[in-house]
Amino acid sequence: MTDMWSLKICACLGLLLLFKPIDSMGWQGPKVDCTANGTQTECPVACPETCEYSGNGPCVKMCGAPCVCKPGYVINERIPACVLRSDCPKDVVRKEDMLLGVSNFKCFSRNYNCS
């Protein structure tokens, strides 16, 4: 089990990676390619629905990756991109919740190196 300090440190590091200063007046998320079926948003949930996870389980209270899928689409973490639920890999077993899902979505943008 992760202690509270580790969780807070992880949350701060995640936000620093997602946002960069634009000037002394505020912050702005980086420009990202959210693929054809996704869109950029300021603070999406950290545990969205994916091919593997329902998105209904408990989740950390912080911003997730900068992209969200359009209605009817879910994240396929293998690509990563938004796909129709029916286009998810057939070998994926759906689960109700994910543990610290934020780190699972760091690659959901072509601006991140995920190799």
Swiss-Prot record:
Disulfide bonds join C34-C67, C43-C63, C47-C59, C51-C88, C69-C82. It comes from the Eukaryota. Residues 1-24 form the signal peptide. Keywords: Behavior, Disulfide bond, Secreted, Signal. It is found in: Secreted. This is Accessory gland protein Acp62F. GO terms for cellular component: extracellular space. Responsible for physiological and behavioral changes in mated female flies. May contribute to the toxicity of seminal fluid and the decreased life-span of mated females. May also affect neuromuscular events after mating concerning sperm storage and egg release. It comes from Drosophila melanogaster (Fruit fly). Residues 34-88 form the TIL domain. It holds the Pfam family TIL. Produced in the male genital tract (at protein level). Present in seminal fluid. Transferred to the female genital tract within the first 3 minutes after the start of mating (ASM) and crosses the posterior vaginal wall into the female hemolymph 5 minutes ASM (at protein level). InterPro entries: Ser_inhib-like_sf, TIL_dom. GO terms for molecular function: serine-type endopeptidase inhibitor activity. Coiled coil: none annotated. One of its GO terms (biological process) is negative regulation of proteolysis. The keyword Secreted applies.
